[in-house]
Amino acid sequence: MIVEVFFRNYYRNYAKLEVDEVEKREFAFQPFVGGMVRHKAFKNLEELKRHLVEKTPRHVYYSTARYERPWEEDMERKGWLGADLVFDIDGDHLDTEACRESKVVSLACLEDAKEEANKLIDVLTEELGLKPTKVVFSGNRGFHVHVVDEEVLALGQKERRELVNYLKAVGFDPSKFHMKVGRRKVVLYEEEAVGNLLRIRRGIEDPEALKVEVDEVVTQDVHRLIRAPGSLNGKTGLVALPLSVRDLEKEVAHIVERAIAFRKGNLRLRFEKPFQGTVLFEKVEAREGDIKTLPAHVAIYLELQEFGKIYD
């Protein structure tokens, strides 16, 4: 499979994986053929990279949790040591015109996701006193925001669910909002604090505007697997790109451009279904059965999206 060869070359020559405390993480891999492979562990990033070159999976995931024995298949035997606090903002979950209209990587939809990520970061820092330590472009239609701090590692599912409810303004009542914030912070930090309440100043007349659209399942799950920063997204061929918080002040086109892994050469793609649109800055129009010569990153994207097949 030609795409697999490109993935292998990326992991051999270009990949810059960013996973801290590798030896305490469970890794999981989705191969190009076959089912998910889980409960893998590695001593360091170099050992992980050698595995990626040898096996070349389509997707690479790692646990937000740290374990004493990450290789154990029985979750009870892994020895849970705490979990990063991770928030997933996905264009698939945003009810905006741009995200509803497009299922490919759309710059307009990504702008909406970026704005939601900035909103989340404001709430975390200004209202809850949490400092995001890592932001990752997912390589598809969203962003992952990581908080890695001693005070959040030990939070259980209940506390994380309370935090999600706060972010999504579940049960919002303006007359009781100060009390609600206080209760949430008592649950999370065992101290009384009200926070800056930026969202009240911005949107008190519209409770819907107070919500931050995060995927609650990702944040609540203390054993969650999430895409490894620096790995390739097997749906697009783009890099799951580590970013700084300041990168979210830039246009998303700049972020997507940086995430393109395959910048050299062209590939021929035989279309198995019609397509018309813009793919990674390239306008493409084809009927079923057409053969087009396209930039490598565009052809790989379209094959991974099952619009056609690359051939020699």
From Swiss-Prot:
One of its GO terms (biological process) is DNA replication, synthesis of primer. Its cofactor is Mg(2+); Mn(2+). The active site is at D88, D90, D215. One of its GO terms (cellular component) is DNA-directed RNA polymerase complex. Keywords: DNA replication, DNA-directed RNA polymerase, Magnesium, Manganese, Metal-binding, Nucleotidyltransferase, Primosome, Transcription, Transferase. Its EC number is 2.7.7.-. GO terms for molecular function: DNA-directed RNA polymerase activity; metal ion binding. InterPro entries: DNA_primase_S, DNA_primase_ssu_euk/arc, DNA_primase_ssu_PriS. The keyword Transcription applies. Belongs to the eukaryotic-type primase small subunit family. NCBIfam families: primase_sml. Catalytic subunit of DNA primase, an RNA polymerase that catalyzes the synthesis of short RNA molecules used as primers for DNA polymerase during DNA replication. The small subunit contains the primase catalytic core and has DNA synthesis activity on its own. Binding to the large subunit stabilizes and modulates the activity, increasing the rate of DNA synthesis while decreasing the length of the DNA fragments, and conferring RNA synthesis capability. The DNA polymerase activity may enable DNA primase to also catalyze primer extension after primer synthesis. May also play a role in DNA repair. Heterodimer of a small subunit (PriS) and a large subunit (PriL). This is DNA primase small subunit PriS. The lineage of its organism: Archaea, Thermoproteota, Thermoprotei, Thermoproteales, Thermoproteaceae.
